[in-house]
Amino acid sequence: MEAFQELRKPSARLECDHCSFRGTDYENVQIHMGTIHPEFCDEMDAGGLGKMIFYQKSAKLFHCHKCFFTSKMYSNVYYHITSKHASPDKWNDKPKNQLNKETDPVKSPPLPEHQKIPCNSAEPKSIPALSMETQKLGSVLSPESPKPTPLTPLEPQKPGSVVSPELQTPLPSPEPSKPASVSSPEPPKSVPVCESQKLAPVPSPEPQKPAPVSPESVKATLSNPKPQKQSHFPETLGPPSASSPESPVLAASPEPWGPSPAASPESRKSARTTSPEPRKPSPSESPEPWKPFPAVSPEPRRPAPAVSPGSWKPGPPGSPRPWKSNPSASSGPWKPAKPAPSVSPGPWKPIPSVSPGPWKPTPSVSSASWKSSSVSPSSWKSPPASPESWKSGPPELRKTAPTLSPEHWKAVPPVSPELRKPGPPLSPEIRSPAGSPELRKPSGSPDLWKLSPDQRKTSPASLDFPESQKSSRGGSPDLWKSSFFIEPQKPVFPETRKPGPSGPSESPKAASDIWKPVLSIDTEPRKPALFPEPAKTAPPASPEARKRALFPEPRKHALFPELPKSALFSESQKAVELGDELQIDAIDDQKCDILVQEELLASPKKLLEDTLFPSSKKLKKDNQESSDAELSSSEYIKTDLDAMDIKGQESSSDQEQVDVESIDFSKENKMDMTSPEQSRNVLQFTEEKEAFISEEEIAKYMKRGKGKYYCKICCCRAMKKGAVLHHLVNKHNVHSPYKCTICGKAFLLESLLKNHVAAHGQSLLKCPRCNFESNFPRGFKKHLTHCQSRHNEEANKKLMEALEPPLEEQQI
C-alpha cells in the first residue's frame, strides 16, 4: 500500500526538486532528475518503488539495488526497474509469499519437536522451546550458525534418546526436509543430517548402551562424514539416554550447550532477529552432533576442559571430523565458559548445580560410557589415529580458542575450581593418571592463574592435556604441540605446555620445578615423563625433545632478559618447525638426546645469528666492531688490487646501478680510506652510528620526486632508489646498515642480508660442466645457462668437425 501511495504522491508533483524543470508526467520528471542530477539518485524514489537506484560517482554508473543491472544511462536503469522489478503490488506480494513459504517450514519443524518434547519432562520442554528459537534464528548466523544451530540436534537427540527412535525419525523427516527446501546454502547438509538422524535412531533403541555405540561410532567417524554424523548422534544419544534417569541433567547440559553454541549473547540475539531460514538446524545438526558428543561423552572431562582448550582436544579426539567444524565447537566450549559467569546465568546455573551431580552421574553413566565410548582404546586410538585431521584442525581451533581465552580465563577461574574438582571424581581412570587433582593443581592451576592470561591459555590446556593426553593416548600431545607450533601466539607456551603434560606424571614438586625454571629444564626430566606415559607419545616426545633442543639455544641468549625469551621462543619455534621436518624420524630418547646435543652445539649459533641478528642491535654492534678490526687487517691486503676499480666506481657510481651483492664490506672500508675529504665534509659518524644505520636513517639523505630518488647531500641526477642508496654508500660514506657477520659483506636492505645469510647456510652450488662454484642461486643459474649454451656450441663444433672429414673424403 505504501508503494501505491508513493506512486500517487509523485504524480501530483511534476516539478524537479533541484531546478526549475517541469515535466509532463511523473516518469519524465524522474528521468530528468536521474539524468541531470545523478548525485541525488540515492535519495530518489525510483518509479515509486523506493530508493532502488544507486549512483556510483567514481565510475559514473547507475546500479539497480535489487540485482546486478548497471548502466551509464539513468533511463536504462529506471526502465529496467519498472519492468523487471515490477509494479509495487507484485513486489509487495512476492515478499509475502516468500515469507510464508519460508516461515511455514520453520514453524512446522518446531511442532514435531514440541510434540516429541511432551514425552520428556517439563524441563526439557521449556529448554527445547528456548533452543528452538535460538536455533531457528541462530542457524542463520553465517559463520556462527553451526554454533547456535547445534542446539537442534541436542534437542532432537535428547527427546530422541529419551523418547525413542520413533519420535526421532519423524523429526528428521519433517524437519530436515523442509529446511532442506528453505535453507538454500545448506540443504545438502540438512539432507545428510536426515540420513544421519535416521541412522542414529537405529542405534537409539540401544543407545542406552552408550558403550557399544561409541566405539563403533568413533571408528565410523574415521570412515566418512556421514558415519561421523551417525557416530556422533549415537554418542549423543548414548550418554544422554544413559543418563536418561537424570533427565534434568540432560536438560541442564543441553541447555547450557544451547547458549554455549549460541554462546555469545550477541549471536543469540542476532540469531533471533535473523530470518526463519535458520532452519538450517538440520545442517547445524551435523556440527552439533558432535557437540553433544563432547557435551556428554567428554562430560567427565569437560568440567576441567570447560576451563581450557584442552577440552577441545577431547571432543575432537572423539572424531577427527569435528576438527573441521571445530572452530565453532571450540568457541562453543569456550563460550560456555563465558556464559557460565555472565552470558546465560540461567542455563549455566543448572550446570553448576547439576555439575557435581551430572558430572558424577555421568561418570556413573560415563564410567561405562567413558570406558566404552571415550576411553575404550579402540575408540580413542581411532580418533587420534587420524593425526591429519588433528593437525589440520588445531590451527583453526587454536585460533578461535586463544582469541577467546584471555577473557575466559579471567571469567573462568571461579568456574574452574568447581569444574576441576568434579572432574577428577568423574572418570577416575582418566583423571588419576592425569595426576589427581592435587597433582594437577601444583603442576598447573595455581601457578597458571598467577601466570599471564596467555600462559593460562595454554597451561590449562596442558593441564587438561594430561587427561586428554592419556585418554587420547598420545595422539593429542603431539598434535597439540603441532597445533601450538602452527601459531606464533604461544612463544613461551611450548615450554609451559611441556611441563603440563610431564608434570602430572611426575610428582607435584617436579611439576612446579618445571614451571619455575622453564628455561633451565633439563631435557631428561621431561623425557622420562613423556616417554613412559603413553608409549605412543614417543613420537610426540620427539617434537618436545626438538623443542627442548632449540629452547636451550634461546636459553643461552635468553638467560639475560625475559622479554627476549618470548621473542627467542617465537623464533626458535620457527626453527623448531624446521627441526620437526628434519627430525621426524628421531623417536627414541637417545636420538633425541643426540639431537639436543648436536643442535645445542651446531644450530644455536647459526639460528640465533640468522634469526636474531636483525633484531638484536647489541650483537650487531659487537660483531661490527670485531669484524671491522678483522677486516681491516685481513681484507685490505686482499683488496689492494681492487682499490683502482673502486676509485673508478666512485666517479661512475652515480650512473651505474651497482648490484647490491657486489659491494664488499672491505671495499667500503677501502672507500672510507680513499675518500676521507668527502666523509669529513658531508657526514661525521660515531662508531656506533657507523656500525648501525637503519634504512630509515639512510632515507634521510634521500628525497623522492616524480617517482625517482635524489641524493640530498649533493645534486646528483634522479635515480632509482637502489642506485641512490649505493651512491650514498660509495660517494658519501653512508655505511650500509646490514652486515653479514660471516663474511662481512654489507647490505642496504635487511631482506638482502637475509638472503645472503641464507646462502651461507647452503652448500656450494657446483657446475657439472666446469669448475664454477657459487653460494648464490641466482648467479649460479645465470652461469648454468651461459655454460650450457657454451657447452652446446662446443658440442656442435665437435659434431661438425666429426662430420666434415668424411665429406672431404667423399669429395676426394
Curated annotation (Swiss-Prot):
UniProt feature, compositional bias: Pro residues: 202-213, 284-297, 336-361
Modified residues (Phosphothreonine): T403, T458
Listed Polar residues bias regions: 220-233
Biased composition (Low complexity): 363-392, 499-512
Region (Disordered): 86-124, 136-546
Molecular-function annotations in GO: zinc ion binding
Modified residues (N6-acetyllysine): K490
Domain of life: Eukaryota
GO cellular component, one term: condensed chromosome
Main location (coarse class): nucleus
UniProt xrefs under PANTHER family: CHROMOSOME ALIGNMENT-MAINTAINING PHOSPHOPROTEIN 1
Assembly, per entry: Interacts with MAD2L2. Interacts with POGZ, CBX1, CBX3 and CBX5.
Name assigned to this protein: Chromosome alignment-maintaining phosphoprotein 1
Native source organism of the sequence: Homo sapiens (Human)
